[in-house]
Design a protein with these regions (language model features):
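Short, well-ordered alpha-helical segments
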Residues: 7, 54-57, 103
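Hydrophobic pocket/interface hotspot
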Residues: 13, 25, 33, 52, ...
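A solvent-exposed, acidic/Ser-Thr-rich amphipathic alpha-helical stretch
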Residues: 24, 30-81
Length: 144
């Protein structure tokens, strides 16, 4: 049995972020890839939807300028022949403030001929924003 496309993509993505080695990653991303990271775009401009390999590689370059990945744990994963879904926990450092950040995310990826054709990443943004701001978010009290 051959290695699932998710494993190759995951390794190449982390090398692209931490070591700025995008060559391996470029070969694993389809020219017409459909990419979206759901979260507060005003705070994190690299969130949002992108289309095409060049746009995705630019987003990854922007992410690499802002964070370093220290650790990631797959909490659960489901693999199909050309798809993958996973819940993950990441330990990162925000490079501008040298600040540790922990976050959870869910990702849903589709592959064709071993290349990423679509990915959706949903981030626990409430927790992420609190960590980025360095304080809890004050919510209005709900009166019943």
């Amino acid at each position: 049995m051959t290695e699932h496309s998710l494993w190759r993509f995951s390794r190449a993505l982390h090398r692209a972020i931490n070591e700025r080695q995008r060559e391996d990653l470029e070969a694993l991303i389809d020219e017409e890839v459909d990419w979206a990271i759901y979260g507060p775009i005003d705070m994190f401009p690299f969130f949002g939807a992108r289309r095409g390999q060049a746009a995705v590689l630019e987003v990854i370059r922007q992410i690499a300028e802002k964070i370093r990945v220290h650790r990631f744990d797959r909490e659960s994963i489901m693999l199909g022949a050309e798809s993958a879904a996973s819940m993950m926990r990441y330990s990162l450092t925000a490079l501008d403030a040298n600040k540790p950040i922990s976050l959870r995310l869910a990702q849903f990826a589709r592959f064709k001929a071993d290349r990423l054709i679509s990915i959706r990443i949903l981030i626990d943004t409430f927790d992420l924003v609190e960590q980025a701001l360095g304080q809890p978010i004050r919510l209005p009290k709900i009166v019943s």
